[in-house]
């Protein structure tokens, strides 16, 4: 078995898209604290400036639509000229969400998601890869998702884009064999970020009449991992030379169920959810009795 190639990115320049909030902001903060000059990009200028204000290392800020291939190439050229140290890693992290059944899906929403979640990753990879290849070291780190491991209802656009990121990154990694450059897939589970708040919702995909604010609250209640912990896991995984980084206990659960029961994992998840709900109700009832 081929051993993982350990690498050090601390102290080297890092590029991070989707850095205005969530995992991207947490990565910028963590890597900045590990002496990395950071080039941060996002379409949200206000959030990006808030991230910049929290950093303690040389920073390059760029308002960027990752779906714009030419803008990505311009950003890469700017980073090449600016970077005070060799490039250690490029984190193609920007992402958005939608939710609807296949029949209710709005094509414009699906295109919007795909242009950011998949083509944004491709654009960033193609823009920065020549720099890494030239220096013969570094990592392309692409954010897929736990939904790039298993398919889920009402998430056909999101799942398909994240599966595409996974396949693209795995293929690229094979192309880079024998070089000092690698490509890494990141599969976050439920992370407490703004992705649901910023998603495009037309109506409750489950037909329960929930508002977007209610769905945001439900998502926050089930997230198991905070962004700073996700950033720690990703940073450590890159330096350990992992080809795939699972973020959060739910990511490991989905990965395991997808491997063991590739056609029945959703049924098993439903059974597990029922058990957890019963335990939660029983625990709440016991607390009321004691009080």
What does each of the following model-derived ranges do?
Residues 125, 161:
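Active-site helix of classical SDR
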Residues 4-38:
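Canonical Rossmann dinucleotide-binding motif of NAD(H)/NADP(H)-dependent dehydrogenases/reductases
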Residues 178-249:
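SDR active-site lid
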Residues 45-46, 63-74, 107:
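The beta1-alpha1 cofactor-binding region of Rossmann-like NAD(H)/NADP(H)-dependent oxidoreductases
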Residues 101-102, 106-114:
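Substrate-binding pocket helix/loop in short-chain dehydrogenase/reductase
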Residues 145:
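Residue(s) in the substrate-gating loop at a strand-loop-helix junction
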Residues 103, 150-157:
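Active-site loop immediately N-terminal to the catalytic Tyr-X3-Lys motif
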């Amino acid at each position: 078995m081929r051993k993982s190639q350990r690498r050090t990115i601390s102290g080297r320049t890092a590029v991070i898209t989707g850095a205005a909030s969530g995992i991207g902001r947490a990565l910028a903060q963590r890597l900045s604290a590990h002496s990395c000059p950071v080039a941060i990009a996002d379409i949200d200028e206000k959030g990006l400036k808030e991230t910049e204000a929290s950093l303690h290392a040389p920073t390059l800020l760029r308002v960027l639509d990752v779906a714009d291939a030419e803008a990505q190439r311009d950003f890469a050229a700017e980073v090449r000229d600016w970077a005070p140290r060799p490039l250690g890693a490029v984190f193609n992290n920007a992402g958005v969400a939608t939710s609807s059944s296949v029949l209710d899906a709005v094509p414009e929403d699906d295109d919007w998601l795909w242009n950011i979640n998949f083509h944004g990753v491709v654009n960033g990879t193609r823009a920065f890869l020549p720099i890494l290849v030239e220096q013969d070291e570094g990592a392309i780190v692409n954010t897929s998702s736990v939904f790039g491991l298993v398919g889920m209802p009402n998430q056909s656009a999101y799942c398909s884009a994240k599966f595409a990121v996974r396949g693209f990154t795995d293929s690229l990694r094979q192309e880079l064999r024998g070089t000092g450059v690698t490509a890494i897939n990141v599969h976050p589970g439920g992370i407490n970020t703004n992705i649901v708040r910023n998603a495009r919702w037309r109506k409750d995909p489950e037909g329960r009449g929930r508002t977007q604010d209610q769905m945001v609250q439900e998502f926050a209640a089930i997230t198991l991992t905070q962004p700073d912990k996700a950033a720690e896991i990703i940073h450590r995984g890159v330096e350990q030379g992992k080809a795939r980084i699972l973020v959060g206990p739910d990511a490991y659960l989905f990965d395991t169920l997808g491997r063991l029961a590739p056609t029945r994992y959703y049924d098993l998840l439903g059974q597990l959810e029922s058990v957890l709900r019963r335990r939660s109700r029983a625990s709440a009832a016991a607390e009321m009795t004691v009080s």
